[in-house]
A protein has these predicted regions:
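Mature-region segments of soluble proteins
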Residues: 64, 71-199
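C-terminal segment of N-terminal export signals and the immediately downstream linker at the start
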Residues: 1, 5, 21-56
Length: 199
């Protein structure tokens, strides 16, 4: 991968990583039912894709809410719409088109009908681990667009970070210290029951 491409991809991820008060307020401002919300950037198919993918990656358990219950898809839509520049939005849109075409080879089929197994197969086949060779990137190292694997990994990273930084998860699931003034030296298991601290 060329340095320029690596820097471009790092820039996309770094924009999300630098959590500023405006990003936090954007995350906290994402409210509403995941079924009835109207996205600002995402198309209806992209909304379905992000919503299903988020719940497959972070499903509801007995002790934790699912990604859609803490409005992760709404945050991703708002982040792409308000933070990414026009060029990055176009690159993201092209990546969505490509990945949805893989998930739904028949363009006339309804994406709502895609099963959890189809999503999992997409992830198994196309979301490569660090160090694995990306055949799309190898075939065209000069391409300015994200490969399917790069896009799925960036979406995964965004889903996890939006989930961890949501108010519900930060205050009620992770160890929460609203005024972290004291210094604690000890075993994490002993101090927080094994939970990491929220931001």
């Amino acid at each position: 991968m060329k340095r320029r491409d690596a820097l471009k991809n790092i820039g996309f991820a770094a924009g999300f990583a630098i959590i500023t008060p405006s990003i936090f307020s954007m995350l906290q401002g994402c409210t509403g039912d995941s079924v009835t919300w109207i996205p600002n950037y995402l198309t209806s198919d992209e909304k379905i894709f992000v919503t299903n993918l988020a719940d497959i990656m972070i499903p509801k358990t007995a002790t934790t809410p699912s990604a859609t219950e803490v409005n992760v898809p709404q945050f991703i839509d708002k982040y792409i719409d308000e933070v990414l520049d026009t060029n990055d939005q176009e690159i993201t849109r092209a990546a969505f088109v490509k990945v949805i075409a893989i998930l739904r080879p028949d363009a006339t089929a309804d994406l709502v009908d895609a099963t959890t197994e189809q999503y999992k197969a997409l992830l198994d086949d196309h979301m490569l681990l660090k160090g694995e060779i990306d055949p799309e990137r190898t075939a065209d190292p000069e391409a300015m667009l994200m490969t399917t694997s790069e896009f799925l990994n960036q979406l995964k990273w965004m889903i996890i970070n939006a989930y961890k930084n949501s108010e519900e998860v930060g205050e009620n699931i992770l160890a929460y210290d609203p005024v972290p003034a004291a210094y604690y030296c000890g075993d994490l298991q002993e101090l927080t029951g094994g939970k990491s601290y929220s931001l």
